[in-house]
């Protein structure tokens, strides 16, 4: 079983949109949702699933809206939540921003989309590219005299339309890796993880087949193979266009791509990663009236690489004032609402070390920090580099017309949840 009805509520719990799919749950049941939500919130027991009698409310919040599905027992909760999040994604594709105003301005389109997204409580067409073929931004409906089925619905390749043409055929490939890191005050790595994605921007005519080859160091956990000195990717997820049977046989990533932007695959890598941008801080207090913080930052990556847009957030006492800064490179500013100094460095070459000194007054002479200081946060982006060593070895583009196409590859390593604890 799946959803009986779907509601979109404003921030006060008033229904803006409702769609009854099965008729087995009274639509008035939604009146119990907001009181239940507020009660659980006051009790500190808020949960994504609320119940009133035999009726269950599965809900998510997006911006100033609540999306709620009602259902009776034995429903597939994970399916319902996936549908709600996919609904948000589709609405954002149509309206850019999903909020109360965009719902009120597009009632007709919203109802049309809800009719196509779900049928008798079960998700149906949730691909926004297919939906946009016959539900337009103007809300034009299909001609009633003719039965016109969008070609992608009957096509074996539902994610790509036929007849696409470009004057210049190109494919842009982005390999992006985010580094999640937690380092203790002694410099030991407590947690480290690489989260990677391979994104494509496709401008190709016709119905091309693409074959993507990664370097030999890369190993996929789901193949069950193992070698030394390999990069073992975990939680590998592919776009629906990838031929999984071909991948299982020879690890070739073969697919007919959607048009435009899409995420081909994502992966995770649990491995010991040293800080690519490291920072150490020393704090000194003088007679409880002033404090001096010295921060040393070091680029621990190849000298030929450069980290761009580096931001180092250094925590300072909550009662600090009268800031003065001295930096060997970049600029520093005090952000009192966050109790941090942000040291910004536009370009940070590998192997370099830089210093920043900050001086503050301390008007509250009685305070002595009891709790530990918050960690230093670091943001950065290193182009032409991946921490895992993953590389695109080749991209073959095969199309029956035989045209030539150019593949472009870009590598980016960036900070994710990147924290360095201080003593």
From Swiss-Prot:
Keyword Lyase: no
Gene Ontology CC, one term: clathrin-coated vesicle
Description of post-translational modifications: Phosphorylation of membrane-bound AP1M1/AP1M2 increases its affinity for sorting signals.
Nucleotide-binding among keywords: no
Biological processes per GO annotation: intracellular protein transport; vesicle-mediated transport
Annotated compartments: Golgi apparatus; Cytoplasmic vesicle, Clathrin-coated vesicle membrane
Membrane topology: Peripheral membrane protein
Gene3D superfamilies: 3.30.450.60, Mu homology domain, subdomain B
GO MF entries: clathrin adaptor activity
Domain annotation MHD: ranges: 168-421
Top-level taxonomic group: Eukaryota
Self-association state and partner proteins as the record states: Adaptor protein complex 1 (AP-1) is a heterotetramer composed of two large adaptins (gamma-type subunit AP1G1 and beta-type subunit AP1B1), a medium adaptin (mu-type subunit AP1M1 or AP1M2) and a small adaptin (sigma-type subunit AP1S1 or AP1S2 or AP1S3). Interacts with P2X4.
Family label: Belongs to the adaptor complexes medium subunit family.
Function: Subunit of clathrin-associated adaptor protein complex 1 that plays a role in protein sorting in the trans-Golgi network (TGN) and endosomes. The AP complexes mediate the recruitment of clathrin to membranes and the recognition of sorting signals within the cytosolic tails of transmembrane cargo molecules.
Protein name listed in UniProt: AP-1 complex subunit mu-2
Organism, scientific name: Rattus norvegicus
Lineage, highest ranks first: Eukaryota, Metazoa, Chordata, Craniata, Vertebrata
